[in-house]
């Protein structure tokens, strides 16, 4: 049977995600971000709620991306997620994209010319951001044309790069409805961004989310819930450069700006430059919030939930893969658990995120 991997955040889970799961074939394994997501912000509802949403709509197995995989630039995010999925035995990767390209050929190009391509990236001017450098790399070596703001398209290329040489078939599907950052409400499929913005509009949420009641009754958070704690962390840390990816320039810009702002977005706007993108700054703020220092990734894989098919698949791979089903009995990743403790501070109604929690089971 085909084993399909899906890399996701489900922030929150919506009809477009259900469409993706319906399209995927065989056993469907989701590698999902935990309580903090790739663009550098807390997930609107916790990882257990989002895993339940996925399992109730077609996923067979949901595993958690460790913090240092989930909150990273596209290449590291994709590489870490693909590594986890490949260890779980996937033979194909299904993902949504704004533009369906021949990602398989692109992966082959990278497999053949990776050293030359990475050397090209290193040769580009330092005032370019890393995303700008990788775009130039894909333009030169694979003839990819970049138009507009298409994060799923960029992630698709990162997936192709991560899957190169691994024997994984790439199955892109055209993104349905609104664009990734679209706020439009008059669409066939609303974006996660729009759903987060209009979360108080119950009719809108009901229309575009298959698990709308679960979403609406679950504790929710945003950056606003952590703003004061973030400011405290910046003001009281004597050496911000001890935090992952914080250099002297970023530390100086943060210290200068933090007393002049009243929201996280204002801080991002003041600190971001051409070289330091807003997404990168948000990730750095997330690292500061949770006190992240450089840390190795866990070798084991944390399971959030499974269907009967997913449970059978887990049994078939457990001899070759170290699986953690209950963190209280077996340690997993201390940084992710630390981040989860901080996440819980955002809403007093949030449940314990690790100790005593067992995988969600659906029939």
UniProtKB/Swiss-Prot annotation:
MF terms from GO for this chain are: ATP binding; ligase activity, forming carbon-nitrogen bonds; tRNA binding
Q: Name one Pfam family in it.
A: HIGH_NTase1
Q: What reaction does this enzyme carry out catalytically?
A: cytidine(34) in elongator tRNA(Met) + acetate + ATP = N(4)-acetylcytidine(34) in elongator tRNA(Met) + AMP + diphosphate
Which Enzyme Commission numbers does its entry carry?
A: 6.3.4.-
Could you list this entry's UniProt keywords, alphabetically sorted: ATP-binding, Cytoplasm, Ligase, Nucleotide-binding, RNA-binding, tRNA processing, tRNA-binding
Q: What does this protein do?
A: Catalyzes the formation of N(4)-acetylcytidine (ac(4)C) at the wobble position of elongator tRNA(Met), using acetate and ATP as substrates. First activates an acetate ion to form acetyladenylate (Ac-AMP) and then transfers the acetyl group to tRNA to form ac(4)C34.
PANTHER family referenced in this protein's UniProt entry, alphabetically = TRNA(MET) CYTIDINE ACETATE LIGASE
What is the protein named? tRNA(Met) cytidine acetate ligase
Source organism: Streptococcus thermophilus (strain CNRZ 1066)
């Amino acid at each position: 049977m085909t084993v399909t991997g899906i890399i996701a955040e489900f922030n929150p889970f919506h009809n477009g995600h259900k469409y993706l799961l319906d399209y995927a074939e065989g056993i469907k394994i989701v590698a999902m971000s935990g309580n903090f997501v790739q663009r550098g912000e807390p997930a609107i509802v916790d990882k257990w709620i989002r895993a339940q949403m996925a399992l109730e709509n077609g996923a067979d197995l949901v595993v958690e991306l460790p913090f240092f995989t989930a909150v990273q630039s596209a290449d590291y995010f994709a590489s870490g997620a693909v590594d986890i999925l490949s260890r779980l035995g996937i033979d194909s990767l299904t993902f949504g994209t704004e533009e369906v390209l021949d990602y398989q050929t692109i992966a082959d190009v990278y497999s053949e010319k990776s050293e030359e391509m990475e050397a090209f990236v290193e040769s580009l001017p330092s005032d370019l951001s890393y995303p700008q450098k990788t775009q130039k790399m894909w333009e030169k070596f694979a003839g990819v044309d970049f138009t507009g703001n298409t994060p799923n398209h960029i992630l698709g290329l990162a997936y192709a790069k991560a899957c190169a040489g691994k024997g994984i078939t790439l199955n892109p599907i055209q993104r349905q409805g609104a664009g990734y950052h679209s706020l439009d409400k008059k669409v066939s499929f609303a974006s996660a961004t729009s759903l987060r913005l209009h979360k108080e509009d119950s009719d809108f949420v009901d229309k575009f989310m298959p698990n709308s009641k679960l979403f609406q009754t679950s504790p929710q958070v945003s950056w606003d819930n952590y703003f004061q704690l973030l400011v405290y962390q910046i003001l009281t840390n004597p050496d911000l450069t001890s935090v992952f990816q914080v250099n002297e320039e970023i530390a100086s810009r943060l210290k200068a700006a933090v007393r002049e702002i009243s929201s996280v977005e204002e801080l991002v706007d003041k600190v971001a430059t051409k070289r330091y993108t807003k997404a990168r700054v948000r990730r750095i703020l997330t690292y500061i919030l949770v006190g992240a220092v450089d840390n190795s990734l866990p070798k084991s894989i944390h399971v959030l939930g499974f269907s009967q098919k997913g449970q059978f698949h887990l049994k078939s791979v457990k001899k070759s893969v170290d699986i953690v089903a209950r963190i209280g009995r077996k340690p997993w990743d201390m940084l992710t658990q630390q981040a989860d403790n901080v996440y819980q501070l955002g809403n007093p109604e949030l449940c314990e995120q690790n100790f005593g929690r067992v995988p969600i089971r659906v029939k």
